[in-house]
Each structure stands twice: as C-alpha cells, then as structure tokens.
Amino acid sequence: FNMEHDVAAARIIFGCGVALVQLPCAGVVSEFATSGPELECHLRGKNKLCDYLVDLTKSEAEKYAKGKAWTRIIWDVTAVAWLLDGDFEEDYLVHSPIPGYDNHYVLDPQRHFIRYVYHVKRDSLFTDLFAKLGRS
C-alpha cells in the first residue's frame, strides 16, 4: 500500500543496501485483523485504555460497515512485532526487488538481500498484544 504511493522513494530504499524488512500488506499483514466481538471479549473492562481502543475501533468500523460484519487490520503492530520477537512472524532472505511503476517487481539475483516476512502468526501476536494492553 505505502509503496504504490511513492514508487520513486521505494526504489531508493530497496536499492540503497540498507538493512530492510519488507512486510507485504496483501496476504501477509492483512491477516492481522480483529473484530468487534474479539475486542469486546479480550479488552473490554480491562482498563480505561482498553475501553477507549474498543470504542474507537468499533466507532470507526461502523462508519464503513453500517451494521454489517467487519474486521479491522492493525497494520502498525506487525512492524513492531518483528522487532520484538522472532516468534510472531516468519521470514526469509530474498534479493532486494526493484519496485516497478506498474506495481510489479523486477527481480535481479545480483542485488543485495533483504528480509521478507511471509507469515504473521496472528493468534500468538494478538494474545501477546491483548495481554500487554490489559496490563496498561
């Protein structure tokens, strides 16, 4: 998502050789979603922060769901999770791709390596997140 908004910047970051971890949105980070009932079950009544987060998330979701079932992806938590513990996500090394202006990658096996996250352990990460928020 972020990359398609500034491909030129992405090409610089992916090409400069800096240590880089890529967390793809579609099919990877997008799996880290929660629902109203899940938030109610695990956060409601734990403390003021938890109640605020439940209320805010449900309020925002209702703006687009309008009474239908919904889930919310908690994008930013996955980046922090990679830094915290290698057990929340699975990754491997790949040659740094070249982001194309057509929303595709050009692959070059001569380029430096980056770390590519291919799986978020959703339940483990939410269990940890809910426990930490509940202690706040």
What are these regions (language model features)?
Residues 1-4, 8, 14-15, 20-136:
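Conformational coupling and interaction surfaces
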